[in-house]
Structures are given as C-alpha cells and as structure tokens.
From Swiss-Prot:
The keyword Cytoplasm applies. CDD domains: LIM1_Testin, LIM2_Testin, LIM3_Testin, PET_testin. GO terms for cellular component: cytoplasm; focal adhesion. It is found in: Cytoplasm; Cell junction, Focal adhesion. InterPro entries: LIM1_Testin (IPR034958), LIM2_Testin (IPR034959), LIM3_Testin (IPR034960), PET_domain (IPR010442), PET_testin (IPR033724), Pk/Esn/Tes (IPR047120), Znf_LIM (IPR001781). Residues 133-164 are annotated as: Disordered. The lineage of its organism: Eukaryota, Metazoa, Chordata, Craniata, Vertebrata. It comes from Oryctolagus cuniculus. The keyword Calcium does not apply. The gene is TES. GO terms for biological process: negative regulation of cell population proliferation. This is Testin. SMART domains: LIM (SM00132). It holds the Pfam family PET. Scaffold protein that may play a role in cell adhesion, cell spreading and in the reorganization of the actin cytoskeleton. Plays a role in the regulation of cell proliferation. May act as a tumor suppressor. Its main location: cytoplasm.
Amino acid sequence: MDLDSKMKKMGLGHEQGFGAPCLKCKEKCEGFELHFWRKICRNCKCGQEEHDVLLSNEEDRKVGRLFEDTKYTTLIAKLKTDGIPMYKRNVMILTNPVAAKKNVSINTVTYEWAPPVQNQALARQYMQMLPKEKQPVAGSEGAQYRKKQLAKQLPAHDQDPSKCHELSPKEVKEMEQFVKKYKSEALGVGDVKLPYEMGGPSPDKLYIPAGDRSTPAALGPMESKPAECKGTQYFCYCCKLSMKEGDPAIYAERAGYDKLWHPACFVCSTCSELLVDMIYFWKNGKLFCGRHYCDSEKPRCAGCDELIFSNEYTQAENQNWHLKHFCCFDCDNILAGEIYVMVNDKPVCKPCYVKNHAVVCQGCHNAIDPEVQRVTYNDFSWHASTQCFLCSCCSKCLIGQKFMPVEGMVFCSVECKKMMS
C-alpha cells in the first residue's frame, strides 16, 4: 500500500461500539460515542475499554497485525477475503461431569484464551495459578479483565498509523520504522513449559542439599537425563521464590532461557499487570507491556494518547502533548497562553473550571474562582474574605481566628453555637 493510500485510509472508526453502555458509569453514560481525536467517550470521558463494546474480531486483527512480519506468524492466519492477518487465539474448552440426582450433566468452561501448548493439563494448571479474577473464562470478570488489558497494553494506535489522528507523511514513515524496530528487537511471546524441559540450568539456579555441599554438581543436557532435575531448584526471576516441582513456568526467549517466571509473576515492570496473552516486550533486563515499552522509547501525548513523532511538542504538568492537543479537557479549547487548572491530572480552562468543577462558597453560595484565596475545612469551603468567612450567628469575621464548625456552619464561640441550635 503506497503512502497516499495509507493517508486516505486513516480514520478512528467512530461507528465502532457506538451506543455501548459504560461498565463504570452505568446509566450516567448515554452510551459510547468516540471523541473526534481523544480515545475516550464524549459522554462520560471513560475509555472504550470501559464500555461493553464487542471487539473480539477487531482485537484479533490488531494482534494479528502486531505479529505480521515477525517470527510469530504461526500465531496468525490471513483472511482470504481481504488478506488481513488474524490472530489465531487459542481457546480452551474444558468439560467436567457433574453428578446430579437422576443423571450426570456436563459442565463446560470456556477460556477465551489459553497458552498454545499441546498438553492441555499443563494449560489448565497454568490457568489455576492465575488469580481467579484474572482467569479469562467466557462471561466472567476475568474475560472482561483480559479485554481491558488488550486495549490498554496493546493500543492499536501504537502500531497502525491509520488509527492515529492526522499524521504527516513524515510521521507515518517514522512510525512504521519504529514499529519495525520494536518487532525485531523487543517483541516476544512467552512459552509455558515445565522448568526441566528447557535444558540444563545455569550454576546460580542449582540447588545443593545441605548435606552434600562439598560434592561438585555436574551440569549437562537435561533432556538426556531427566531424573537429574530432581536435585535442581528453580527460582522465579520476578519474585525470587522457588518454583514448585511439576508447576508450569513461563520462559521469554528474548530474556534467555536461564530466566523463568511463575504464571502470576509474568507482569509488566511498569504497571504490574499480567502480560495479556503472554505478549511481552523485553528491554534492559525488564518485561514491559506494549504501552509501557513504547512509553520508554517515545513521548506520549496526554491528550490523544498517541506516541509523538514530531520534533515539536509541549511539556506541561510532567506530561507531553502534541501542540494542537494541549486543550481544555471539557471544551477542547487550546490552552496555550491561557490560565488553566488541573482536575484529576487533566487541564481545564478557567471558564470550564468555574462552571463544572469549582467548589461553592458556604458564605455567598457562589463558585470560588481558582485564583482566589479560600478557606477549606473538611468538605466545606469559603472565600477567604471578610464578607464570606463569618460566624453563622453574629457575622464576626473569622479569618485568622479560632472557630467551631457544625454541618457547614461556623461559629466564633459556644454561645453563638447555642443560639443557633
């Protein structure tokens, strides 16, 4: 596909998931409606991953594209209709007989993803070692967790220029080079195996029983003498605790096969979340999810959530922004040279702050301007003025004085409090 075609293809898919209910805001959200350049809902300001959007095909396309032109092409299949690579996600279905009073019924459990191993018992064991709330059983909290992490850890706009907003041809080329580089240097998929299946351990992983410490240990290929593995103890690279004999471990090829992880320890070193579908990025001796690997390589715009490939961008409040995206979170007006207030780490212009976020003075019942001094006690605020911060009984100014708060009122003395009770 030539560059012009790629530029024409760019779009954010605003119809996708339209009207889907928000799982976080419930009835407060009118339904998902994608903001025209932010990756959030225009109605409730939550991300698409917080909404009940059916994205299984889209997510499989996204992961399929990630694995395209890598050594992991065995995990994808190209559709005959459009040639788009699709992720061949391994689904595991377990059937358990359940004894009833009259007959035996079958209880079926479907895992929306499972490690692609031939030994289903090993895959089942792997699942049981994950926290219950993170096991991707269809229709469960764990399936919702996986869906959310796919969106969070592997943003489509971190690998596909057509999912980004108004990139220049130069930025498209730079992004394509960046994606090609991380595919060849950092991207990987974990392997689930029993520790002894990977060959001889390194000397620092060898465990010598207390009574035999003077006996030299012989290292050799474990495949040829599997019985020798009983004298070996393996340790998790993350938690440093030992692996129990017979338990599955995760290996990461880019890290080297002398390192292994408990299934629940195979997490991103930045966000500490399980690496979704064991997809990892390896850098400087650490595991990263896709999002946080990219964050370690490129600045990310706090407005549109995309990586910044332009040489010119702005920094404010310890965050990075495209020049055109340093805008009010409420009204989208550009904030360059304007007064703004940070609300939940989002910049808001002064008019929107006064209208939507400002606290109300208990004295005059007007919004308190962000630049004006105020007095705050618990959940109550007052203008720090002789007209507002007054005794609720005798109207004595209380600035710099002791006071008695009672349910939004303040008193200068016990006597005044008694008079109002």
